């Protein structure tokens, strides 16, 4: 039914405004792609739709939109760690719990991993098709720069 379909695409009902909505972020993709996606799914399931933008309408009809990326490596500023995020958990969750230093964050419902383990996170991300957020990329580059600039010393015996 209609409600199940829009809920499966992560839309929520606003009882005050009497409409379905979805907050969009860097991770969800563009408005036009998400509008085309929900339009396409509604059409495929026999619902009539009305989209006022002709380009988005064509994308909805043809299914020609960028698929939503549902697995992300984000940067958690509060914990200063890389955060593995799933829109829907899958087999990669168990694998993430094997990365050294992982910790489940109950507040964010993500798996946090200290940035010093960025190589393991990168390997994991490649294997399980996770995308890095811009903030995570910046944090990793900053960490690598700090490591390069660390002064190595040899302590004399006294």
Task: Kindly give the residue locations of the regions a language model identified.
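Accessory DNA-engaging acidic/polar modules
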Residues: 1-158
């Amino acid at each position: 039914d209609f409600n199940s379909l829009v809920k499966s695409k992560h839309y929520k009902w606003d009882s005050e405004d009497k409409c379905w909505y979805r907050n969009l972020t860097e991770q969800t993709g563009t408005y036009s792609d998400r509008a085309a996606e929900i339009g396409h799914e509604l059409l495929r399931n026999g619902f009539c739709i009305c989209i006022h933008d002709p380009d988005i309408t064509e994308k909805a009809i043809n299914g020609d939109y960028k698929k939503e990326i549902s697995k992300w490596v984000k940067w958690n500023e509060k914990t200063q760690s890389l955060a593995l995020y799933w829109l829907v958990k899958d087999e990669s969750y168990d694998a993430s719990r094997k990365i050294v230093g992982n910790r489940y964050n109950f507040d964010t419902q993500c798996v946090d991993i200290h940035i010093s383990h960025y190589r393991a996170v990168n390997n994991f991300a490649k294997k399980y098709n996770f995308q890095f957020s811009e903030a995570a990329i910046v944090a990793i580059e900053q960490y690598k720069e700090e490591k390069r600039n660390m002064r190595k010393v040899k302590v004399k015996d006294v």
